[in-house]
Amino acid sequence: MIVVRKARVEDINLILEFEKKLYDNQVKITNKFSPQHNIDIALKSDYKEILFKYLKSMIYSKHGAIFISEFNNKPVGHMILSIQKSHPIFNMKYFGRINTVYINKEFRRRGISTRLKDEALKWFKSKNIKRVSLYVFPDNKHAIDVYKKWGLTSSIFEMRMTI
């Protein structure tokens, strides 16, 4: 059975593990398809402390949330959400951002991320948010396919270079 719940402070170490697995997976994808972008995702030496503080602030924030997914009472993934300010020239003042989605590899393709997405949309709606966005590396084909199934569409194509 799939259960989705709000994260608690005692979940932070678990979320840190999930975030590390997510990062390691992204490094593999980046190394394979676009190694020139490794510079963009290089971690600071004290990233764990920084991430711990960030996660704690998101758990307590009115403008952020973290959801944990459990499969048969075992935590198997998470989603981090935030509310972002739009550029001041736009009518839309705020939008929702899905910052992170991670499901342990052995539990994928079971509808768990979709359940997380459903809870995220409920949370955003409760905050009167009408638009939701996320970032995804273009080489992460599996994630892109999932997000398209959720109804997300491409909006901006970001390009980078080293100077």
Model region roles, listed by residue range:
Residues 46-67, 97:
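A short helix-loop-beta-strand connector motif used in the catalytic cores of GNAT acetyltransferases and
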Residues 1-13, 17, 21, 28-37:
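Conserved N-terminal entry element of GNAT/NAT acetyltransferase domains
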Residues 114, 138-156, 161:
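Conserved active-site alpha-helix within GNAT-family acetyltransferase domains
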Residues 24-54:
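Conserved GNAT-fold acetyl-CoA-binding loop/helix
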Residues 124-135:
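Conserved GNAT acetyl-CoA-binding A-motif
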Residues 82, 92-105, 157-160:
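Conserved acetyl-CoA binding element of GNAT-fold acetyltransferases
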